């Protein structure tokens, strides 16, 4: 059984890590920002903590699999992420935000089960992807900075 201190640490770490990803989305004015990412991560962490708690209580009475609840979280976040995706004449927008919601759900699940270092590493890699690869996309690939992640500038600009 986890102590209150362990539970608080896991929940707080989930908020901090997922908040960092959400802050990047907020700064770039995406559909889902700081609060949404924090709530997805916090909820995922709490669901994992609850799953572990239930598993611990009933492990000798009923065969349970704590991973089943985690799988439900990932499926549910897929629906939430789909709500951030917008398709118009210019292309598709919101794919990166949908992916970031999926990542923070995984970070929340990882912190909830005590897999703290991988949760931290995944957050760092997500932030590197969101902050630094944006620059590479703009300069090397010629992507527009309008949130449209499926449209590219013409290769022969000015012709």
Q: Each PLM stretch: what is its role?
A:
Residues 60-81:
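Alpha-helical transmembrane-segment detector that highlights a single hydrophobic TM helix
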Residues 1-67, 116, 135, 154-159:
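Alpha-helical transmembrane segments and their membrane-interface boundaries
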Residues 39-49, 72-75, 99-112, 154-156:
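Small-residue-rich segments of transmembrane alpha-helices in multi-pass membrane proteins
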Residues 15, 77, 123-124:
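Residue-level signal for the membrane-embedded core of alpha-helical transmembrane segments
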Residues 137-159:
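Intrinsically disordered, low-complexity non-transmembrane regions of multi-pass membrane transporters
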Residues 19-30, 79-93, 133-138:
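C-terminal ends of transmembrane helices
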Residues 125-135:
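Alpha-helical transmembrane segments and their membrane-interface exit regions
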Residues 10, 68-69, 114-127:
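Loop-to-transmembrane alpha-helix initiation sites
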């Amino acid at each position: 059984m986890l102590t209150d201190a362990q539970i608080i640490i896991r929940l707080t770490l989930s908020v901090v890590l997922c908040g960092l990803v959400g802050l990047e989305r907020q700064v770039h004015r995406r559909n889902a920002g700081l609060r949404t990412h924090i709530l997805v991560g916090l909820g995922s962490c709490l669901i994992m903590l609850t799953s572990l708690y239930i598993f611990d209580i009933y492990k000798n009475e009923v065969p349970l699999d704590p991973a089943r609840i985690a799988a439900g979280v990932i499926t549910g976040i897929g629906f939430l992420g789909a709500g951030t995706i917008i398709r118009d004449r210019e292309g598709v927008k919101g794919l990166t935000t949908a992916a970031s919601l999926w990542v923070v759900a995984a970070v929340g699940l990882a912190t909830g089960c005590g897999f703290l270092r991988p949760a931290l590493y995944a957050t760092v890699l997500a932030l590197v992807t969101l902050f630094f690869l944006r620059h590479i996309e703009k300069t090397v690939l010629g992507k527009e900075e309008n949130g449209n992640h499926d449209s590219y500038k013409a290769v022969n600009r000015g012709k």
